[in-house]
Amino acid sequence: MNELLSYLKQFDIENAEEKSGLLMQYMQSVLEWNEKVNLTAITDTEEFVQKHFIDSLLCAESLEFTASSSICDVGTGGGFPGVPLAVCYPDKEFLLMDSLAKRVRIVNDICAQLGVTNVTVVHGRAEELARQLEYRDRFDLCVSRAVANMRVLSEYCLPFVRAGGTFIAYKGPDCESEINDARRAVRLLGGEEPEIRKTSHLDHSLVFVRKSAPTPDAYPRKAGVPAKKPL
């Protein structure tokens, strides 16, 4: 907890002690549920703080995050990065999405129990949710830590972002080749040139894609197609 609290204070998070405590309660709840439903492979508390909490908060240092009020998290799993961001930035609204109904119910329930009111978690595949008018071309920012190739992840995520908004993908240290291969897909989906920003944490990278035009109606393709036939 001390490491998490130090990090929150380092980045001038208001009410850092309270938010650090809330996140630690969230961790305990996730780990308890994890014995019944697969929410995370990380069960060591120090590693959880490093790889789930601090890692999730890396994008908050960016101007793009600061300027955003509506944020969606695609493939949230156990609530990452969406829940840590929502806890630390209660003035922003978060929509979290996951394809497994059990995970959605659990994350919703834990957030409700802890009083995290700026989070909504919905069940569905990104390819289908992005076809719904209430979600399409709507968000200032889309974030995702989902394990998927950038060509696939862009088709999942960019349709949710409004023109002028940003998509941020959490990636590993050596993602240049993957991002180069995704340039055509990003352009097709209304995005501009991807920008890789290195972080000081765990050698991770954040890939920023600004969206300059609405995503064409043809995308995303039907559920399962993006993964099988990447753009």
Where would I find each of the regions flagged by the language model?
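Class I SAM-dependent transferase core
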Residues: 2-67, 72, 102-105, 109-119
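Residue-level signal for inorganic ion chemistry
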Residues: 30, 85, 171, 209
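Conserved SAM/SAH cofactor-binding pocket of Class I
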Residues: 57-148, 154
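Helix-to-beta-strand junctions that scaffold the AdoMet/dcAdoMet cofactor pocket
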Residues: 89, 161-163
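Short alpha-helix immediately C-terminal to the canonical SAM-binding loop
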Residues: 103-105, 175, 179
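Conserved beta-strand signature within the Rossmann-like core of class I S-adenosyl-L-methionine
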Residues: 164-174
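SAM/dcSAM-binding transferase cores
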Residues: 180-231
